[in-house]
A protein has these predicted regions:
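C-terminal beta-strand-loop-alpha-helix "lid" module of Rossmann-like NAD(P)-dependent dehydrogenases
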Residues: 1-288
Length: 288
């Protein structure tokens, strides 16, 4: 059985850990709110750029669409896997990697696979399973469009060169604080938004011509798609970390209560033993 001194030391150690996890929980909660606000702030731009592409596609015509919008036979597929740089985020990265591995392994053996990873956790998990075409581990957990530009440029250039015929992205969708759902979406060929009736009826003049504007706008649309996914990743990471640290804090509190109970029982037993010894000595002296 542990001594009172050992129990006191362990109580102090667990209490110090609890203070750390509590602080990390509060920091994650603050960052999660900022990440959610960033997701909300990006939506108007995404909505407007989607509407503009609707009008440009209608004005351009299917025969003049840029190559990035035109499907072709799939012989090479690239997977963009978005993960975090840091751990202590519960099962978030494990679920993302598991979804990515499932999607990659389900791809036909006749299709050549390329894997592009964002985040140190994805790099560590996937480097032993596949040959990674590129790894990005220097992107901030509060990303900007400029931060993800090298990623999207790599994919756009590779698709235009014919290095791959399809690009799929694996990332976590922030549903709520307790739920982050891994999703797989196709980046290339770009999935065209459905042309709405008001877009068909809109009379807009594009200069120099709709095809040129569309070709210049599509990379921005891809950037926004990846950027929004990175914002979802940031919100998911902070919410998962907040939940994990809250659970760790609660577990530490329960452990401290158990240790204090054991310490008090041991201390009470020692006091009782000392009282018995004193009483026995007093009785022995009285009998003498």
């Amino acid at each position: 059985m542990a001594s009172p001194l050992e129990l006191r030391r362990r109580i102090r150690s667990v209490d110090n850990t609890r203070q750390i996890t509590r602080a990390m929980q509060l920091v994650a909660a603050s960052r999660m709110r900022r990440a959610q606000e960033a997701v909300q702030a990006a939506r108007p731009y995404a909505t407007h750029i989607s509407g503009m592409i609707e009008r440009l596609v209608l004005a351009t015509g299917n025969d003049r669409l840029p190559p990035i919008l035109q499907p072709r036979p799939i012989e090479r597929t690239a997977f963009l896997v978005l993960t975090t740089n840091r751990g202590l985020a519960g099962p978030l990265n494990t679920n993302i990697v598991r979804t990515a591995v499932s999607e990659i392994d389900a791809t036909s053996d006749a299709i050549e696979i390329s894997v592009v990873v964002v985040g140190k956790k994805g790099h560590l998990a996937l480097r032993g399973l596949y040959t990674l075409s590129a790894v990005f581990t220097d992107i901030s957990d509060q990303p900007s469009v400029l931060d993800i530009a090298p990623v999207t440029q790599l994919l756009v250039d590779g698709y235009e060169r014919g290095d791959f015929d399809e690009v799929r992205m694996v990332y976590p969708e922030f549903v709520n604080i307790l739920t982050q759902q891994p999703r797989v979406v196709r980046l290339f060929p770009v999935v065209l938004p459905e042309v709405q009736q008001d877009a068909r009826e809109a009379d807009i003049i594009f200069e120099p011509d709709p095809a040129s504007v569309l070709e210049a706008l599509i990379p921005r649309f891809v950037e926004m798609t990846v950027y929004r996914a990175m914002l979802e990743l940031a919100a998911s990471e902070q919410s998962a970390r907040m939940v994990a640290m809250r659970a760790a804090t609660e577990n530490a509190t329960e452990l401290i209560e158990g240790l204090r109970l054991a310490y008090n029982k041991l201390r009470q037993a020692r006091i009782t033993s000392e009282i018995i010894d004193i009483a026995s000595g007093a009785n022995a002296l009285a009998d003498a």
